[in-house]
Each structure stands twice: as structure tokens, then as C-alpha cells.
Amino acid sequence: MTATFAPPANAPRVTLHLGALDGWLALSEDERYELPLGLQTLVHARFKDRMPDALALEQGIEEVEDAIMPASAWLPRPVRLVTRDALLLDIARVAAAPEVLTREAVEQLFERLARQAERAGPPDALLPQQPAWAAALLVLRECMHHWQVEQIQLESV
């Protein structure tokens, strides 16, 4: 298990939103960065409206990377990433992370999704079998990895 370091308390707070048709990061109401990526778009175009197989997952990763990589230059360092998104809160629930979801926990869930995608047979009983949930997990994993964010703070709606 690797150590997870919380950002300093005075680190800028950035809200992550992943919507059906688009996403965004916000430092404030006036300062936003649009992410050209939507969960339903990913589900429809890459997952073909079902849980992803290995190829769909790989294609989804490529699409997500292209969409999120430019945001890395916009993000302040260090950063406190936060979210109120229902799907991201549900990912945290599955990971048993009530207040803070770590990159390590996200990676563990993604590994389960990848194993499920690579094999035939019954689905992983821990993972919700909803394509939008899988898309949100994929996007969150790629964001945390490429933006080098160790945790995301969860705020109830």
C-alpha cells in the first residue's frame, strides 16, 4: 500500500463535474475550464451503451486522455480536487470511502473493471453494472492519474 498525501489546507480548491454531455473544472464561478467530454457520449460512442469490453475500455482511455490532458496545465499545484457528482459519490460508496476517495482506491476499482472487461462470465458482484458508472470510473481514474491528484474530496449533494 502506498502513502497518500493530502494537499495543504491552503491549496486552491477545484471542483470537478462530469456531466452527461460535458464536464468542467472550476476554481470559482468565474473561472472554469471546460472538459470536452461527456459520460453519456463516452457510453454511447465507445461502450455501445453497455458495460465495456477490453477494446471499448482501451478506446475510452484514449478518448479521455485526449480530452483531459490539456487541463493539466490549467490546474494549480498543489490542488484540492472536490466533487458533488452523484456517480463519483457512488464510486466512493463502492470503495467504502465516505469523505475522501484516494487514487489507490480508484485504481483498485478500475482493476476490477478491467478484469471484468477481459473475460466472459458473470460480472464482478462489487461493481454496479451500469455503463455510465463504468465511464465515470474510467474518467476519474484518468483524471487523477494524469493530473497527479492523490485524492478527491467528496461533498454530499
Describe each region flagged by the PLM.
Residues T2-A11, L27-V157:
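Helical "lid/coupling" subdomains associated with nucleotide-phosphate turnover
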Residues R13-H17:
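Short glycine-aspartate micro-motif
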